[in-house]
């Protein structure tokens, strides 16, 4: 069974095209990311899935049941979804414990309040109000509240964007653990490619035209990007243009092997930083000589491997 199926979805706001023929599927109990730059229509797509906006063209199915089309709109409260907004939307007049209990009062939940309190990791803050919590603590409470009613589908809109780097990594780890433990189908909107690769089983990359340009597992998109847009979404690359002769192209960093189908054509080659190896030894046959002009430390773009 598919948790979500989006078919030919298009949407306009004030006659401006926001979504353009969007199609994708989410398998049951899996995690998908909608990845794209600001203004690509990610949040609009999430609102349409949630039923917060009406569909103009196309179809949305949840658990194989149509919930939205141009002629049908199932109210949000009947879709069995959880929604975590960017600003968390906690009830300011309720304590942490009361916020967590609120969904249970209206739905039959497989969770009990004590089950979810362990996940929140705030045993000393249950009687505090949201304004007394840090941003990370509020995020934990909001996430737990969205899951406690055991929705069929969980929608997270940029859940980590307001957190500082160190706290973001900690909360992201906790979130992934909770999502895997709860087995809830989840769609996460983000503009951070590394975040998407870490937390999801499937990534759907959107462009500024409101279209999904490529979908697939993180490794597939990283290793086999469909075009330059997808390639550069996962980090900066060294770009070289040239003509293919004898199944190779000559670049400033050496000869690059190219598929024979590009013979005698002008092509663009993208090389990630980790694809270039430096050595003080004599230049190999396919290499080239150069001089290191500067070295700077920014951030890690290579996988971190823990050896035990």
Where are these regions (language model features)?
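Conserved small/polar residues in nucleotide/adenosyl-binding loops
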Residues: 40, 298-304
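Conserved ABC transporter NBD signature motif
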Residues: 58-69
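Helix-to-loop junction immediately C-terminal to a conserved catalytic motif
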Residues: 50
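ABC ATPase NBD coupling module
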Residues: 67-83, 221
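The feature captures the beta-strand-to-loop junction immediately N-terminal to the Walker
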Residues: 35-37
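Glycine/charge-rich catalytic "coupling/switch" loops of P-loop NTPases
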Residues: 252-295
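ABC ATPase nucleotide-binding domains
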Residues: 80-82, 95-229
């Amino acid at each position: 069974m598919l948790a979500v199926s989006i078919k030919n979805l298009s949407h306009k706001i004030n006659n401006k095209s926001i979504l353009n023929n969007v199609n994708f599927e989410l398998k049951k109990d899996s995690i998908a990311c909608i990845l794209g730059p600001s203004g690509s229509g990610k949040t609009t797509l999430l609102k349409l899935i949630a039923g917060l906006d009406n569909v103009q063209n196309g179809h949305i199915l949840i658990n194989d049941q149509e919930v939205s089309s141009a002629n049908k709109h199932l109210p949000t409260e009947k879709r069995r979804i959880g929604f975590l907004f960017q600003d968390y939307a906690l009830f300011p007049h309720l304590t942490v414990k009361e916020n967590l209990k609120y969904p249970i009062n209206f739905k039959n939940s497989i969770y009990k309040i004590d089950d979810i309190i362990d996940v929140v990791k705030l045993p000393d803050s249950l009687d505090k109000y949201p304004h007394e919590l840090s941003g990370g603590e509020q995020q934990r409470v909001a996430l737990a509240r969205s899951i406690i009613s055991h929705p069929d589908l969980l929608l997270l809109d940029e859940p980590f964007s307001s957190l500082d780097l160190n706290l973001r990594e900690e909360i992201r780890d906790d979130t992934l653990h909770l999502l895997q433990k709860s087995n809830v189908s989840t769609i996460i909107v983000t503009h951070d490619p590394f975040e998407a690769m870490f937390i999801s089983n499937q990534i759907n990359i959107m462009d500024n035209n409101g279209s999904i340009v490529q979908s697939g597992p993180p490794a597939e998109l990283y290793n086999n990007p469909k075009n330059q847009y997808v390639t550069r979404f996962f980090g900066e690359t060294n770009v070289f243009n040239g003509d293919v002769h004898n199944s190779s192209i000559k670049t400033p960093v050496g000869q690059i092997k190219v598929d024979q189908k590009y013979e005698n054509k002008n092509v663009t080659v993208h090389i990630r930083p980790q694809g270039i190896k430096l050595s003080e030894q004599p230049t190999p046959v396919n290499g080239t000589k150069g001089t290191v002009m500067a070295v700077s430390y920014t951030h890690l773009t290579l996988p971190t491997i823990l050896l035990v």
